[in-house]
Amino acid sequence: MNRRLIICVGLLLFTFSSFAQLRDIPKEVEQAFTAQYPNATAVEYRDNLVNVKILFTHKGEKLIASYNNAGKWKETEKAWNFEQLNADIKDGFQKSKYADWKVTETKIVNRPDGVELFRVKVEKNEIQKKHLFFNAAGRLIEDFITL
């Protein structure tokens, strides 16, 4: 019984992963990415139908860039450590209503027009999880529910 279940699950995962790429990556996205990051290496495109996420290495750092289907850059994120955030951001988090939530992930997010935000993923329990976006001064700019 267990063996059959494992085989079925394995076949399902294989089937879903082989059909995950439903279409070719839009040329506009590829061109915009190549223009923005000409020296990127280890490039991996992930098509989400409404946007494309691109995992890559640039100047020794692992990054994720997001573009819409027309090739317009939305943001680039880089993994970061909460303890490395400046004192203003940590203070802003401690003064927020999420201070008692557990920090599970921190990223630096660069957006068009030179906007740099610091995304802190927090969770209170298995159901209540949020992405918090702080500016460099420690002000909470946005918060979104996440999975």
Segments predicted by a language model, with ranges:
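Exposed beta-strand-loop-beta-strand "reactive/processing" segments of non-cytosolic proteins
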Residues: 41-64, 114-132, 146-147
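Boundary of Sec targeting at the N-terminus
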Residues: 20-21, 33
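N-terminal signal peptide c-region/cleavage motif recognized by signal peptidases
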Residues: 15-17
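Positively charged n-region of N-terminal signal peptides that target proteins for export
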Residues: 1-7
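A short linear hydrophobic-aromatic micro-motif
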Residues: 39-45, 102-107
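Short, low-complexity, Pro/Ser/Thr/Gly-rich segments in the mature regions of secreted, periplasmic
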Residues: 135-147
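Mid-chain, structured segments of secreted extracytoplasmic proteins
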Residues: 65-106
